[in-house]
UniProtKB/Swiss-Prot annotation:
<dbReference type="GO" id="GO:0009368">
    <property type="term" value="C:endopeptidase Clp complex"/>
</dbReference>
<dbReference type="GO" id="GO:0006515">
    <property type="term" value="P:protein quality control for misfolded or incompletely synthesized proteins"/>
</dbReference>
<dbReference type="InterPro" id="IPR001907">
    <property type="entry name" value="ClpP"/>
</dbReference>
<dbReference type="Pfam" id="PF00574">
    <property type="entry name" value="CLP_protease"/>
</dbReference>
<dbReference type="InterPro" id="IPR018215">
    <property type="entry name" value="ClpP_Ser_AS"/>
</dbReference>
<feature type="active site" description="Nucleophile">
    <location>
        <position position="106"/>
    </location>
</feature>
<dbReference type="InterPro" id="IPR023562">
    <property type="entry name" value="ClpP/TepA"/>
</dbReference>
<dbReference type="GO" id="GO:0005737">
    <property type="term" value="C:cytoplasm"/>
</dbReference>
<keyword id="KW-0378">Hydrolase</keyword>
<feature type="active site">
    <location>
        <position position="131"/>
    </location>
</feature>
<keyword id="KW-0645">Protease</keyword>
<comment type="function">
    <text>Cleaves peptides in various proteins in a process that requires ATP hydrolysis. Has a chymotrypsin-like activity. Plays a major role in the degradation of misfolded proteins.</text>
</comment>
<dbReference type="GO" id="GO:0051117">
    <property type="term" value="F:ATPase binding"/>
</dbReference>
<keyword id="KW-0720">Serine protease</keyword>
<dbReference type="GO" id="GO:0004176">
    <property type="term" value="F:ATP-dependent peptidase activity"/>
</dbReference>
<comment type="similarity">
    <text>Belongs to the peptidase S14 family.</text>
</comment>
<keyword id="KW-0963">Cytoplasm</keyword>
Length: 208
């Protein structure tokens, strides 16, 4: 028997839009995509990254000059999956603004700070967490050493990305990511992970 809570969480609301050709129904995420809003919600894994990357590429093809908004509520996840989203954000022509709602932890925080400079935001009660990558391996000793070396390479690369987008020194980034480091929006702004804390939608946004 399915968990009723899981079933409820898998239900996607539908919205109906009136057009000149009559009514048209969209799932809520497709409707947001029409407004160039991508909602990154939940753990980052290969399935999610393929969907996010596809949406980014679709919106670029639709209008390469128009901004894309990415709303993030994620506990993090698989590093390589997150890096595929990160690389696509940097690769495409449209500017990508980011906004954390709820939490941006681990890989979620990296995607948050990867937004266009000056366009990285947080709602006032969101939380941001940074840390170093983790992994558990078993098998032959040589294989464990190979995986440990790869994890170290990923750690070094992630540190470089945080340095690039926060403006902090490598030492400060390494120290900050040594353990789970939870930040308020104010602390995240001071560290350079975000640019502004927003409580209300701006007048210009409300009119668009």
């Amino acid at each position: 028997m399915k968990d009723p809570i899981e079933t409820y969480m898998n239900l996607v609301p539908m919205v109906v839009e009136q057009t000149s050709r009559g009514e048209r129904a969209y799932d809520i995420f497709s409707r947001l995509l029409k407004e160039r809003i991508i909602f990154l919600n939940g753990p980052v894994h290969d399935g999610m990254s393929s969907l996010i990357v596809a949406q980014l590429l679709h919106l670029e093809a639709e209008n390469p000059a128009k901004e894309i908004s990415m709303y993030i509520n994620s506990p993090g996840g698989v590093v390589t999956s997150g890096l595929s989203i990160y690389d696509t954000m940097q690769y495409i022509k449209p500017k990508v603004s980011t906004l954390v709602i709820g939490q941006a932890a681990s890989m979620g925080s990296l995607l948050l700070t990867a937004g266009e400079a000056g366009m990285r935001f947080s709602l006032p009660n969101s939380r941001v967490m940074v840390h170093q990558p983790s992994g558990g391996y078993q098998g032959q000793a040589t294989d464990i050493m190979i995986h440990a070396a790869e994890t170290q390479k990923l750690k070094d690369r992630l540190n470089e990305i945080y340095v690039k987008h926060t403006g902090q020194t490598m030492k400060k980034v390494v120290d900050a990511l040594e353990r789970d480091n939870f930040m308020s929006p104010e602390e995240a702004k001071e560290f350079g992970l975000i640019d502004e804390i927003v409580e209300n939608r701006s007048k210009d946004d409300a009119e668009t």
